[in-house]
Amino acid sequence: MKILICNDDGYQASGIVALYEALKTIADVEVVAPEQNNSAKSNALTLHSPMYVQTAANGFRYINGTPADCVHIALTGLLGYRPDLVVSGINNGANMGDDTIYSGTVGAAMEGYLFGIPAIAFSQTEKGWTHIDVAAQQARNLIKQLIPSLEAVAEGAQPSVPPWLLNVNIPNLPAGQVEGFKVCRLGRRHAAERVIVQTSPRGESMYWIGGAGPAKEAGEGTDFHATTQGYVSITPLHVDLTDHERLPYWAQTAARLTHKH
């Protein structure tokens, strides 16, 4: 069983170290991660500047690129083999609801998914790495349950299935207080907080993106609700952004626009 690990917090982050330590006992694990923090980089790829692969003292390889860059380079030229699973995280903070659109953690996992490999993005719901070892153990528990079916596909004993992509958020709780796992949908957030404006020493205005908005749609069945109840939320994702419900309306609108005069 071969697993590729990436993240968006950088190769030295506590989350990726804890995840590696938890998974190396159940699989062959390779780490390829960004050199620096690349939060909120989504699926961005670096197209106009060169990237370099370096190896840290602990064997982790790191790249001066985005999370998606790291997975892309690993899968298309660095590893020399096809992993059975791509795992991203553990992120320093939640990736729930609208966060998934911006998240570099999700973006790294999605890059693996786009290459036809099952993938999971793991995040811890609060920043600061408190109880990160507990979060890593929860990630290990989930992956351990998936290994038999992944190995069966890899060995040809089970028919291959389309790749899947999971977004997993782990509550920041001590051992024994995590209630279990719950499959749920994405919630929604309110719009982000206002931009923060400061003045530089030269008198110029500087702008900082404000924090994520609070939960807006967080009722039962959402990832927000599950994690506040002490559960690890599991949300299956896909990349089809088509608004299927409104397709007929826009088809009618387009027909009116394109009829011959």
Swiss-Prot record:
Gene3D superfamilies: Survival protein SurE-like phosphatase/nucleotidase
UniProt GO MF annotations: 3'-nucleotidase activity; 5'-nucleotidase activity; exopolyphosphatase activity; metal ion binding; nucleotide binding
Listed GO CC annotations: cytoplasm
Main location: cytoplasm
Positions that bind a divalent metal cation: 8-9, 39, 91
Cofactor notes: Binds 1 divalent metal cation per subunit.
Coiled coil: none
Entry-linked HAMAP family: SurE
Annotated NCBIfam families: PRK00346.1-3, PRK00346.1-4, surE
Protein name from the UniProt record: 5'-nucleotidase SurE
Record lineage: Bacteria, Pseudomonadati, Pseudomonadota, Betaproteobacteria, Burkholderiales
